[in-house]
Amino acid sequence: MQYLAAYALVALSGKTPCKADVQAVLKAAGVAIELSRVDALFQELEGKSFDELMTEGRSKLVGSGSAAPAAAASTAGAAVAAAADAKKEASEEEADDDMGFGLFD
């Protein structure tokens, strides 16, 4: 994934990615570079434009990402409900704290 991300950074900078540029990005990020992986990346991406790769990736994300928003929505709803319960409990505890003794008035 790091190698593909480095490739994407070079492409987004406006340059046509080459092995040396991808290696430079990886080196700047502190990644231990394996030349065989760089070679494999360029073999896999040979003949494909960056725009084509992005379009292909988006179509894959759309197909598999439909369940994620529902899970996030239910988590957000649970967090709101938990916060409301905590607030209610806190106000009940505060009401119990003042029993009318007036010791510190």
UniProtKB/Swiss-Prot annotation:
Gene3D superfamilies xref list: 1.10.10.1410
Listed GO MF terms: structural constituent of ribosome
Post-translational modification: Phosphorylated.
Annotated GO CC locations: cytosolic large ribosomal subunit
GO BP: any one term: cytoplasmic translational elongation
Keywords tagged on the record: Phosphoprotein, Ribonucleoprotein, Ribosomal protein
Subunit note: P1 and P2 exist as dimers at the large ribosomal subunit.
Function: Plays an important role in the elongation step of protein synthesis.
Similarity annotation: Belongs to the eukaryotic ribosomal protein P1/P2 family.
Name by which UniProt lists this protein: Large ribosomal subunit protein P2
Organism name: Leishmania braziliensis
Taxonomic placement: Eukaryota, Discoba, Euglenozoa, Kinetoplastea, Metakinetoplastina
